[in-house]
Amino acid sequence: MFGLFRRRAIAKAPARRTGDYGEEQAAAYLKQQGFRIRARNVQYEGREELDLVVEDRTTRRFIEVKTRRQLPGAESRYGTPMAAVASDKRRHILNAARRYTAAHPTRKTAQFDIVEVYLDPTCDAPRVLAVHHLQDAFRT
């Protein structure tokens, strides 16, 4: 009877694993470009979350990472990664950024970027085809 109440390990959904992998690749790319990773997967209640927070000398960037198993520039049923960051998603990112900044004040300029990670759609194992960093992708 008590066996019914045992917790079972639930495997992450494939889309979530793909997203996690994309975030790792985006962080590695940004680090290689000279940014310092300040935070990953910052979550507040509701849908407010920040995938990555990175900084350089003058700017704090709030990064939304979108990962797709598609060729760069190709259309998919989900549209382009950038198109997936619609007005509702942007509002959630802006609110999360305000909360993060209230908890971690800085004099640096805030900027909102999108990093698109493209994975080879023909491979089962993830293989990065391209990483596109769209700087200052949207404003407050």
Predicted feature descriptions by range:
Residues 31-46:
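A short acidic/basic microdomain associated with nuclease active sites
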Residues 30, 50-74, 93:
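Conserved catalytic cores of phosphodiester-cleaving nucleases, focusing on short active-site segments
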Residues 67-122:
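Catalytic cores of nucleic-acid endonucleases
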Residues 17, 21, 47, 80, ...:
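Residues at secondary-structure transition points
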